[in-house]
A protein has these predicted regions:
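Active-site loop-helix segments enriched in His/Asp/Glu that coordinate
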Residues: 1-85, 99, 108, 112
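His/Asp/Glu-enriched, well-ordered alpha-helical/loop segment
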Residues: 166-248
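Short phosphate-binding/catalytic loops that engage adenosine nucleotides
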Residues: 25, 146, 212-213
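Active-site core of metal-dependent hydrolases
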Residues: 66-67, 74, 80-184, 190-194
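Short, Lys/Arg- and Gly-enriched loop/turn segments at beta-strand edges
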Residues: 251-254
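Short secondary-structure transition/capping segments
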Residues: 8-13, 40-43, 160-161, 185-186, ...
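Residue-level "edge-of-site" marker
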Residues: 2-3, 33, 154, 220-222
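Electropositive phosphate-/nucleotide-binding environments in soluble metabolic enzymes
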Residues: 10-14, 69-72, 76, 103, ...
Length: 254
């Protein structure tokens, strides 16, 4: 869930994931939304991760005017809860961070890593190409061993960001599909709001494929994502692996 964790809830999200899985589209979810304390399916973040197979981590907004502006202590505590629960559950649960435009950038994460013995892999910040200062933080975070997500618009512009990473296996690309986007006036009022189309992801892959080739372009959308989420036997075309393919009218597979 995103901004709206009030009229929408984790129960509905869980039900939709279960429906998709029954239709042979493997679906996983994150508990929580932009806000803190985390809205959960059970009584706690730990129970959600330990007892519900399809929950692979927690969602939270950082450095965004719509976030709860979690304190350093609260962030360390939440990360520790996720860490402990993932060890018990045998998962690679992470804290997926919606990153906003505020100047703090990834500083809350850097502070948490300095204060506690938390693996850098537990944090996965998204929208990291939305402004120059956040992208600079993202490059630093990746050099520390962390993974980052770039949001695509379907126009191939992520290539210029990808080129700046020393290790591209640390990068995933997503579309924020069916999520809301918004722009604001100087006084903070909403200027425009809309929905990000699912098609952006496919358009971005085709654009990158034309520049980089299949083998280099595909992992950002598949293998790297599976690695971040700790999903085994998926993310690549290999004997014994689960693979989802879409066939186009001309016989091409995506």
């Amino acid at each position: 869930l995103g901004t709206d964790g009030y009229t929408r809830n984790t129960k509905e999200l869980f039900a939709k994931a279960k429906e998709l899985t029954q239709k042979r589209v493997h679906a996983y979810i994150l508990t929580g939304s932009y806000t803190y304390p985390t809205y959960t399916l059970t009584d706690s973040v730990e129970d959600d991760i330990v007892f519900i197979d399809s929950i692979l981590g927690v969602k939270l907004a950082l450095s965004d005017h719509r976030s709860s502006h979690i304190t350093d202590d609260e962030l360390v505590r939440l990360a520790s809860q996720i860490r402990t629960a993932s060890l018990i559950a045998g998962k690679q649960a992470n804290l997926t961070l919606h990153m906003g435009d505020e100047k703090a950038g990834l500083n809350p994460v850097f502070h948490a890593l300095e204060r506690a013995d938390i693996p850098v892999s537990l944090f996965h910040p998204t929208h990291c190409s939305r402004n120059p200062h956040l992208f600079k933080d993202a490059l630093k975070f990746a050099e520390m061993g962390g993974t980052v997500d770039l949001t695509c618009e379907g126009d191939g512009k992520t290539l210029e960001f990808i080129k700046q990473f020393k290790d591209t296996s640390k990068v995933t690309i997503s579309s924020d599909a069916q999520g809301s986007w918004s722009t604001y006036n100087e006084d903070g009022s909403i200027k425009e709001i809309g929905i990000t189309p699912v098609s952006n992801l496919k358009k971005e892959f085709i654009s990158l494929k034309n520049e980089m080739g299949y083998e280099e372009a595909l992992p950002f959308f598949t293998q790297n994502v599976a690695n971040v989420l700790g999903l085994k036997n998926t993310g690549m075309i290999k004997e014994g692996f689960d693979v989802g393919l879409e066939m186009s009218g001309n016989g091409s597979a995506f």
